[in-house]
């Protein structure tokens, strides 16, 4: 990273004498821009910075100030900045030297107009002092030295054209001021904030469209990984970077090894905030349905908020390792792994789900997965868990005792069609906000003969105070028994009163966890 320094020049001050009392203030502007120079053609973005002040030479008629009622004056000036730097800029102000007074260089006695010594209003100035303030602040500040510059403005993003920052010079004079020329120099420094250039992926649906466009009827994509080298011109690569990306990202299919490669200069690629449907394969199309292996280790997901349907329909993928995924900003994981019908290994150990509100159909129809560890999941913000585990046909046990469901409103078919499930631990479920439990534990008629669920463990009765929709909650769960042995011959007729711990005098389909 290299700096670019621009000095916009200096102007000359005025005169202060017994006949016409003036002071002159010189303003120097230095702008510093962190610019990145690259020999590579894939760099798309270079930060720029320009700055100016509307007055570089301020002059005040001292006689007019002294003759005024309060012997004070306030002179406005504007610092104007324009930058496309995506992390903004910082502007500071200080005197050019450690001398902060306006100095009469011709005075034999060393006459000065001193800086104020503390923050104060203009009315509180002592005679023959001056200060500076930023924006709409009420108080003026002492003139800052180079060793402790004043922060004028600090932004976090690019400007929308020219951005004006208002300042004011304040002064109080008295008629005992010695005649002469009083001058000083103030320096504005404008520095673009540090910015690390990144490769940013296009939005998920757009990536999906471009990935599918690479797969002709005569070939298929079996693998997806990063290439160490750019594509050959014969590969007909497509661009998959976001418009805000600093680098190009190329995507192409090599038919010789049936691999979809991507390439960019940087080691890692930031996924778009909307990464929904990135590898989505529609149930009625053949595009990218034959992917067998994906290397996603160079993806940085720290900026992603939407991962809904991200891998939905990847029916031939057997292993998915997402241990490098940072999901701390994600709010939507609905359908994320739905219909991955051949998946047998899923690593979600790194998942931070503390911001997720939607987990509907997240694991829907993953029929071959035999174990699922979600003990690290924070579900405190989730409102929708409908169909979350629907048709996870190979799970025999599921421990959801760590789930915080205090904000969930929809649990319909959440645990439906789990035909090999024998026990279920819901010991910390809070259902006080749930309105819909339709078919929550049900089995479809076609799998009724495969019913294996025997125990559902809870700590307390379900809170059904807001439950309005609850048909077929236990449909076809004929092996299920409450802790005291209660059951119905036709479980489909169970109403919400069966969402209780079974005990003497109280029927229910739940068993209290010891």
Region roles according to the model:
Residues 195-514:
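Negatively charged
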Residues 34, 70, 82, 158-160, ...:
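Sterically constrained small-residue positions within well-ordered secondary structures
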Residues 10, 14, 91, 177, ...:
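Intrinsically disordered, low-complexity segments of exported/surface proteins
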Residues 42-196:
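Signature of Gram-negative chaperone-usher
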Residues 20-24, 77-88, 158-162, 248-258, ...:
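Short, surface-exposed loop and linker segments with low hydrophobicity and enrichment for Pro/Ser/Thr
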């Amino acid at each position: 990273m290299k700096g670019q320094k621009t000095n916009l020049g200096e102007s000359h001050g005025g005169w202060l004498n017994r006949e016409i009392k003036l002071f002159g203030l010189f303003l120097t502007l230095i702008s510093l821009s962190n610019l990145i120079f690259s020999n590579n053609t894939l760099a798309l973005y270079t930060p720029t910075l320009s700055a100016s002040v509307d007055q570089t030479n301020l002059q005040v008629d001292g006689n007019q100030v002294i003759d005024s009622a309060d012997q004070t004056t306030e002179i406005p000036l504007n610092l104007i900045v324009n930058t496309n730097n995506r992390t903004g800029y910082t502007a500071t102000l200080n005197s050019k030297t450690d001398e902060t007074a306006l100095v009469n260089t011709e005075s034999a006695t060393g006459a000065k107009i001193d800086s104020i010594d503390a923050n104060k209003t203009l009315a509180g100035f002592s005679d023959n002092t001056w200060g500076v303030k930023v924006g709409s602040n009420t108080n003026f500040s002492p003139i800052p030295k180079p060793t402790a510059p004043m922060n004028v403005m600090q932004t976090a993003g690019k400007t929308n054209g020219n951005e004006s920052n208002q300042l004011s010079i304040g002064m109080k004079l008295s008629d005992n001021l010695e005649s002469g020329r009083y001058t000083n120099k103030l320096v504005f420094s404008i520095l673009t904030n540090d910015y690390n250039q990144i490769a940013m992926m296009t939005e998920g649906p757009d990536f999906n469209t471009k990935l599918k466009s690479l797969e002709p009827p005569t070939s298929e994509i079996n693998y997806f990984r990063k290439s160490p080298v750019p594509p050959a011109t014969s590969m007909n690569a497509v661009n998959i970077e976001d418009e805000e990306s600093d680098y190009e990202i190329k995507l192409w299919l090599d038919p010789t090894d049936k691999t979809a490669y991507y390439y960019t200069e940087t080691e890692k690629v930031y996924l778009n905030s909307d990464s929904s449907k990135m590898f989505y394969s529609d149930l009625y199309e053949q595009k990218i349905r034959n992917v067998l292996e994906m290397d996603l280790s160079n993806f940085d997901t720290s900026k992603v908020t939407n991962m809904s349907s991200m891998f939905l329909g990847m029916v031939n993928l057997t292993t998915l390792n997402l241990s490098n995924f940072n999901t701390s900003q994600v709010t939507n994981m609905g359908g994320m792994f739905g219909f991955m019908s051949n998946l047998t290994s899923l690593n979600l150990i790194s998942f931070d789900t503390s911001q997720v509100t939607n987990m509907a159909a997240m694991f829907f129809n993953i029929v071959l997965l035999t174990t699922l560890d979600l003990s690290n999941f924070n579900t405190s913000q989730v409102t929708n868990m409908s169909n979350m585990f629907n048709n996870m046909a190979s799970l025999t046990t599921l421990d959801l005792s760590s789930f915080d469901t205090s904000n969930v409103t929809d649990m319909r078919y959440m645990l439906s069609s789990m035909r090999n499930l024998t026990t279920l631990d819901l010991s910390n479920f809070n259902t006080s906000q749930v309105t819909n439990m339709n078919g929550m534990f049900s089995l479809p008629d076609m799998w009724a003969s495969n019913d294996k669920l025997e125990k559902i463990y809870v700590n307390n009765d379900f809170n059904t105070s807001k439950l309005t929709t609850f048909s077929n909650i236990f449909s076809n769960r004929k092996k299920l028994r409450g802790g005291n042995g209660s059951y119905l011959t036709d479980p489909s007729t169970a109403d919400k009163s069966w969402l209780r711990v079974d005990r003497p005098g109280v029927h229910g389909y739940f068993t209290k966890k010891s």
